[in-house]
Amino acid sequence: MFVCALVLAVGLAAVMGILYSNFDGQMRKELSKEAAYLAYGVEQQGVDYLKNIKDKSARITYIDQDGTVLFDNEADVSEMKNHSDRTEFQKAEKYGAGESSRYSDTLSEKTIYYALRLKDGTVLRLSLIHISEPTRQEAIS
């Protein structure tokens, strides 16, 4: 009986791990696509393009080459620290794009970040709170 329960628990944990991994990958793909779309708008219209976006499903941060935050749709940029030390920013600077997951002091939540370097060297960063599938679907609706 104990062995059956143990096998069932291990099997359930494995399935949950696979589902979590797939959902996490989907969130990262979504951020990548959204960043490319927003980057085009910023390159055409500048930061004003971001200021006119009503959809708040992702946090948007626009960062200068030196790490100074130029725009954020959820926080006061005058109170934000320089972002040049952030992993996703450094990867975007070096490789053109970068991502990371960590605890956000601003949002007080575990967050997934995706950063994309634009043609002028600025960086557009999108982030999502790392939440479960049902909660994410409710947030989008």
Predicted regions and their residues:
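Juxtamembrane segments flanking the first transmembrane helix
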Residues: 1-69, 74-81, 86-87, 93, ...
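Membrane-proximal, non-catalytic sensory/regulatory domains of signal-transducing membrane proteins
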Residues: 54, 79-122
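Hydrophobic residues embedded in beta-strands of well-ordered beta-sheets
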Residues: 69, 122-123
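Sensory beta-strand/linker motifs that couple input domains to effectors
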Residues: 126
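Single conserved hydrophobic/aromatic residue that forms the stacking wall/gate
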Residues: 129-141
